[in-house]
């Protein structure tokens, strides 16, 4: 796997790795990913410098193997930080996303028992009703910003309803999800940004602690009430665990769909044949998976390898940090032919890793697919002549949870 680290190669690897985090790569990170892929072997690039080393994974097989391995630990760096010094860090430390093994199984089991396929399917009519209303408003204006007008409010209202949160707090909750996203993957985590995140985390803690007390005394419909009451062998979620995982569900239930909708429309604006095919068959069963593959709302995922992980005949050595470039894995030409092209007939679209795999597979995967398929069916049916008027929109300063800040469209 490793090649001799000559001075010339070290410079090439350093340049390729630095480009991954370059703000100029946000609008189109894929050339940077291909540079990393070209320098590696078998979809793995070993980057070793005097003060740090890591494995950068661009291959689908390598990313899939690490995601599924019990030796690939999530959140080790988070758990080693001092949660007493940062409310934001403390918030992350109890999220099941950053736990492993039995601890992760316990947290996921307690939360997933309140997040069933039946509950998700029950959201379909709500999603359709919300889309009707949001798209009516968009049609009345002849267009607008798809982020502010559709992709932010839709998943926010759905997950808030599922959790049992009041609709009049929507703006506050959306702001909180942005703080969580900035904490997990944002660029330039300045003292000012961290101060805002910590302030939001304190506000979240106070809000959810008070709400949990109310729900335990007076249960109401919704996942939060179920999470407050659910027990496994007499054990229930602690205060920190309830808070952190409620915030995780709120943020994850919002960010994936919120970023995918404008990202998908932007890609489709550049591939008019794919848009025309969608208009012709707006309920094609591959729509959600093909857009998840191409857009990859979560571009990176990190793991610490506690032991060797095998990828075919290759061995990834334990003790390494592994940076999984999911956006590259989902466009691996060895797995997906013509990978940059949106192809609704692609036979293996569902092999994407946009929702992870293995023990940390996205708990809300079925909800994300439902929202994506219903949204694009509604857009293609209502607005067959939809046009993206700014094909070079601004992106959020977040290479991990990549998303468009604003996307102007016309629907007249």
What residues fall within each predicted segment?
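Cytochrome P450
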Residues: 1-412
